[in-house]
């Protein structure tokens, strides 16, 4: 089962789980994904060992989608 997780102060929180053959679960995951993007989170998926890329559309076929805040500092 695929997961949508948000990196946060607790480490991470699972926001949704889905299987591509479960339309209701996919729709719930898409809604959670869009809500977090609207709050300013960035969505990342793994593209290989030690590599990831940012996504702006929900990747139904991904095993894990990680949401994180942009890096900030000064």
Feature roles, as predicted:
Residues 1-72:
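Ubiquitin-like/PB1-type beta-grasp interaction modules and other compact soluble beta-rich domains
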């Amino acid at each position: 089962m695929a997961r949508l997780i948000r990196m946060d102060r607790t480490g991470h929180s699972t926001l949704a789980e889905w299987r591509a053959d479960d339309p209701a679960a996919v729709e719930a995951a898409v809604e959670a994904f869009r809500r977090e993007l609207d709050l300013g989170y960035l969505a990342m998926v793994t593209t290989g060992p030690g590599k990831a890329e940012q996504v702006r559309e929900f990747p139904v076929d991904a095993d894990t989608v990680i949401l994180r805040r942009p890096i900030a500092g000064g």
